[in-house]
Each structure stands twice: as structure tokens, then as C-alpha cells.
Amino acid sequence: MSTLVHSLSLPGPRLVRAEILKLRRRRGLLAIVAAATVGASVVAYGILAILHAANPGHHGPAGGVLNLGHGMFVLSLLGSVAAIFIGATAGAGDLGAGVFRELAVTGRARSALFRARIPGGLAFLLSFVAAAYALAATASVVFAGYRTVPSPGLLAGAGAWLLLSCAFWFALALGLASLVGSRSTVIGALLAFELAVTPILASIPALGSGREVLPEVALTRLAPHAVRGLASNGGVVPASLGTAELVLVVWALALLALGEWRTVTRSA
């Protein structure tokens, strides 16, 4: 069995656990991710609850479908930031720390070293995202008041979409960082692309269907209809479901393939 795994260049459990441990040991990264996910959820719904308690006539309840959508916007935006930090760190962290050479000469397949970063990074990231969403989902129901209470189907769909969104940005950051070899460059480039470039391009009607190739536009298309307009960062652009799925798959697989290729061919 171990021979088969090695021949397929699949990462073993030890490699995956090692990747998770490397990420956990970065205290600064841990603080950023916790603040951008769990911290953001607590602060957002805490403020809404305090405002409602202080002036219920002016500020509505903190829960309901409406504020679930607002919460999804906050968590998808900050969760993607956390995903980019984790992906860039997983992809270029060994190079930055000067330990890539030691890993490359251990005899393990380089492709397995790269692929171990995918489940390792996702396990680290999605545990925080899931905890943050659990808080948001609970608050949207408990604090709904007179607002419409989210249905179980909506809560499940919104949670799955949030996990997908964060996992997608992690994959892009991991692949690009492995290709470029610079953590800071990738973080800066992807944050600028997601937070500045994408909203501008998505708001230009003259681009027409060309906007469908933007990752954020494709992700928005996959969001549950009840919160789609509220959770959008790149604007709601008409697109078919199949096109949106294809765009995300091509972006993720292309950058991951390039990242793995560079990891395998990089000079130690």
C-alpha cells in the first residue's frame, strides 16, 4: 500500500500533519486568521446586538436572513483574506525559511510535498471558517426577532458556499506562491486583485460576458439566492451556473498545476 501511495506521489498523513503543524506554529498567522474569521463574526453580530438593545426602534434585530447576508459578506471577504495569507504561507513558507533544500533531499517526491500543503492548509483554514460561520448561523436564528428566520436549507447552503469561497482563494494563493516563490508578493497581488481590481471590472457593463471569468463573479453566482446580493463583493453579474463552476475549476486547477510544476522543477 505504501508503495502505491509513493508511486502516485500522494502525501501521507505524516506530511499533512507536518504542514498543519508548521502553520499552527506561526503565531502571527494564527492571530490574523482567528481575527479575520471568529473575531470578525463575534464583533459583527456583537455590535448589531448592542445597537438593537440600545435603540430597538432605530436598529432592527441582529439576526434573520438580512443580517445573515451581511454576515456572509463580512466572513467571505475577511475569510478570503485569511485564505490568501495561509495559502501564500504554505506555498512559499519553506523557501522563505530556507528549509526547502532540506525537504527536497529527504527522498520524498516533491509533488507529494506540494500536495500535502493542500489538505494541510485547508484543515487549518476551514476549522476557523467553520467556527466563525457556526457563530453567524446561530446568531442569525437566535437574534432574528421579527425578521425572517433562515431555513435549515439556507443555513446549510450558505455555510457550504462560504467554505468553498475560502478554499478557492486558498488554492489560488497556494499555487501562485509556489510558482512565484514569494509570500509577500502573492499576498499583495491577490488582495489587490480581489479587493480593488475585481469590483472595478465587475462594475463595467461594457465588458459584458467577459466579466464572467472573474473568480469573485463566479463565486457570487454560486451563493444561495436569498443572500446573493448581500454577500457579493464583485457585483451580481448574470452568468450561468455551469459557466461559474467551470471558471472556478479552471482558475484553481491551473494555478495549482503551475505551483506543483514549479515545486518539482525548482532548483534546491
Question: Model regions: which residues?
Answer:
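Small-residue-rich transmembrane alpha-helices that serve as helix-helix interface/gating elements
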Residues: 218-222, 245-254
